[in-house]
From Swiss-Prot:
Keyword match Protein biosynthesis: no
Record's catalysed reaction(s): (4aS,6R)-4a-hydroxy-L-erythro-5,6,7,8-tetrahydrobiopterin = (6R)-L-erythro-6,7-dihydrobiopterin + H2O
GO term, biological process aspect, one: tetrahydrobiopterin biosynthetic process
GO molecular function: 4-alpha-hydroxytetrahydrobiopterin dehydratase activity
Lineage of source species: Bacteria, Bacillati, Cyanobacteriota, Cyanophyceae, Acaryochloridales
EC number: 4.2.1.96
CDD domains attached to this UniProt entry: PCD_DCoH
Protein name, as recorded: Putative pterin-4-alpha-carbinolamine dehydratase
Keyword list, A-Z: Lyase
InterPro entries linked: PCD_sf (IPR036428), Pterin_deHydtase (IPR001533)
Organism annotation: Thermosynechococcus vestitus (strain NIES-2133 / IAM M-273 / BP-1)
Family statement drawn from the similarity comment of this UniProt entry: Belongs to the pterin-4-alpha-carbinolamine dehydratase family.
Length: 95
C-alpha cells in the first residue's frame, strides 16, 4: 500500500507540477481546451495511463474545461501515485 506524503514532500513535488495545487487531501488542476471536443479528447488520452497505473482520477467536464482531482482513497490523502499520475496527465494536456 502506498504511504501518504508529508506536507513538505507534497510542497516540494508541487514545485515541479505547474498548475497543480493541493486542495485538502487531493491534488487538483483545471485544464482548458479550445472546445468540448478538445476536452473529451484529453479525457480519452488519460484513460489508458490511469488504467495502467491502477489509479483513477476524479474528473469534472464543463464544455472546454476538465478538472482533474487525484487522491489515494485507501490512505486518505496524497501519495506518490498521485504525483506520478499528475505528471503523466500534465504531459497529455499538451497537444
Amino acid at each position: 500500500m502506498a504511504e501518504r506524503l508529508s506536507p513538505a514532500d507534497i510542497e516540494a513535488q508541487l514545485a515541479n507540477l505547474p498548475g497543480w495545487k493541493q486542495v485538502g487531501d487531493r491534488l487538483e488542476q483545471t485544464f482548458t481546451f479550445k472546445d468540448f471536443l478538445g476536452s473529451i479528447a484529453f479525457v480519452n488520452r488519460l484513460v489508458d495511463p490511469a488504467e495502467q497505473a491502477g489509479h483513477h482520477p476524479d474528473l469534472s467536464i464543463s464544455w472546454n474545461r476538465v478538472t482533474v482531482c487525484l487522491t489515494t482513497h485507501d490512505v486518505g490523502g496524497i501519495t506518490q501515485k498521485d504525483i506520478d499520475l499528475a505528471k503523466v496527465i500534465s504531459n497529455l494536456a499538451v497537444v
